[in-house]
């Protein structure tokens, strides 16, 4: 029979064992993945709809996730549904705020199209400063293709503006809410 102190020692030895910690982390990971399944399913359905050319269905699937501020959904909706000139739902005034919110919260893929929107003044006020800032942030986080674009936009800024934009990029912190 197990008495209190002996049972306590057995439980304590289990809790500190590497195997238990591994199983606990694995269990938490499974719970996290299982709870994310509805979001993943919504993204998967939206991508299938976009591949089929059904932007209305893609928008419907993504809007549910956008309301939850899922940056992946914001990026897909902003880039491929509203930001795509070939889409019947093309509207840069809807695309830019989605990309901005995703980028401000750290979604790196949204930063390059957002920088392009600022450079061209489409959906947001034209600002080479903001364009450079977002490209510099993207480059700092190793976004592919950002270096060439950064150099190109940098040539459009005066030296003092360039330094201010670099400083703004370095000082930028991602929003958490």
For the regions a protein language model found, what residue spans apply to each?
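N-terminal secretory signal peptides that target proteins for export/translocation
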Residues: 1-18
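Bacterial N-terminal signal peptides
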Residues: 21-34
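Alpha-helical segment of the N-proximal tetratricopeptide repeat
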Residues: 41-57, 61-64, 68
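Hydrophobic face of amphipathic alpha-helices that form TPR/SEL1-like repeat modules
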Residues: 45, 76-84, 113-120, 151-156
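Structural signature of tandem alpha-helical TPR/SEL1-like repeats
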Residues: 52-57, 87-98, 125-130, 164
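Short helix-capping/linker turns of helical repeat alpha-solenoids
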Residues: 53-54, 67-71, 83-85, 104-107, ...
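Terminal, low-structured helical/coil segments at or just beyond the last alpha-helical repeat
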Residues: 145-177
